[in-house]
Regions:
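Conserved catalytic-core segment of nucleotide-activated headgroup transferases in glycan assembly
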Residues: 27-33, 39-40, 174-201, 308-309
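Donor-binding and catalytic core of enzymes assembling or modifying cell-surface/extracellular glycoconjugates
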Residues: 179-268
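Mid-sequence helix-capping/hinge segment at a functional interface
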Residues: 107-181
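Conserved small/polar residues in nucleotide/adenosyl-binding loops
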Residues: 1-5
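Short internal beta-strands
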Residues: 44-54, 199-202
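Nucleotide-sugar donor-binding patch of glycosyltransferase catalytic domains
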Residues: 65-68, 252-326
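Active-site donor-binding segments of glycosyltransferases and PAPS-dependent sulfotransferases
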Residues: 49-102, 106
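Active-site regions of enzymes building and remodeling cell-envelope glycoconjugates
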Residues: 71-75, 102-103, 117, 126, ...
Length: 326
């Protein structure tokens, strides 16, 4: 039963327990719906229950983001287990030990398929909310004052980017597809030669180069990384190059132009796309705008395995310059 119908059917419900078993990017797609849900039920407490383990479906770092989401009163963690085939059959039984008996327990589900126009639309429909005409970007929540670690990286980035064409931020690894781009160093060095300052959360770049800054994820949380980028955006031309992972959604939330490297054929990719993303692909998707797709010829990539391809760094730089170069 949908939440709205359940609340109507049982006025004794005192709160809502939302159960999350997803990755960081997946969470970002939920944020417009969560904000709208809270607007509809402002007096109802929202508790979050998050899987405590890293697996192919889940990241406990989602809990850290929910702790900074003002719409949630409490965040709990549970020991879950993924289903080997069907992600919706995730075992979240352990969550119920901390759910008050007068709370409505709701797993955060969405449909993902060729027939689905967008994941955000699916989430609105799942929770009986009117689907917006235009898909809203993810909502991010930052403190009024940057954390000391954010200020430290901000100082480094400001000094490095001074006088450059802009900053290019790289995220070229994906937990969901178990992939890391193998040409990080060459790509970063090529962008630096083109006059850009390069930042990355993916390891493998030219650490000794003064025009390169790798984010230490042990020092800077994912939300702090986004906060850092939001501050840099106000001072520098800022771009993203990312494989289909967290920073597709994050770049949309931050309003940053993104050269999105679609590293495997996924006919459901329109579920995850935002208009700020120029999609590099070796397969033209009929459900994505054609003008937002950059076709990659066979000579522009090599095979990583039977499913995944690696785009050659010189081609990535060529496409980047064509779309965003000055």
């Amino acid at each position: 039963m949908y939440k709205r119908q359940a609340l109507k059917a049982n006025p004794n419900v005192k709160g809502v327990a939302l159960i999350f078993f997803m990755g960081i990017g997946d969470y970002l797609y939920t944020t417009p719906m969560l904000a709208e849900l809270k607007k509809k039920y402002p007096g109802v407490p929202f508790y979050a229950y998050v899987g405590a383990q890293f697996d192919r479906n889940n990241s406990p770092l989602v809990g850290k983001l929910l702790e900074e989401n003002p719409h949630f009163d409490k965040v709990f963690y549970f020991n879950g287990m993924r289903h080997p085939l069907i992600w919706k059959n995730y075992n979240y039984e352990d969550a119920f030990k901390n759910i008050p008996k007068d709370f409505l327990a709701v797993p955060v589900y969405y449909d993902y398929g060729v027939h689905v126009p967008h994941r955000v639309t699916s989430l609105f429909e799942t929770f009986s909310l009117p689907a917006p005409k235009d898909v809203p970007a993810p909502v991010m929540y930052f403190p009024a004052t940057p954390a000391p670690a954010v200020r430290e990286y901000l100082t480094l980035a400001r000094a490095g980017a001074e006088g450059k064409k802009g900053i290019v931020f790289l995220q070229l690894d994906s937990r969901g597809s178990n992939y890391t781009y193998p040409h990080m160093k060459a790509l970063a060095e090529g962008l630096i030669k083109e006059g850009y300052y390069v930042m990355s959360v993916t390891k493998g770049g030219p650490l000794a180069n003064p025009n390169y800054l790798e984010i230490d994820i042990k020092k800077l949380s994912i939300n702090q990384t986004w906060h850092l980028l939001s501050l840099l955006k106000g001072e520098f031309a800022l771009y993203v190059i990312a494989v289909n992972s967290v920073f597709w959604a994050a770049s949309a939330g931050l309003g940053l132009p993104n050269l999105g490297l679609q590293h495997w054929i996924d006919k459901k990719v329109h579920n995850l796309w935002y208009p700020n993303i120029e999609v590099v692909t070796n397969y033209i998707y009929p459900l994505l705008p054609r003008e937002k797709q950059i076709f990659a010829p066979q000579e522009s990539y090599t095979r990583h395995n039977k499913k995944i391809i690696d785009y050659k760094p010189d081609w990535v730089i060529k496409w980047f310059k064509e779309k965003f170069g000055k």
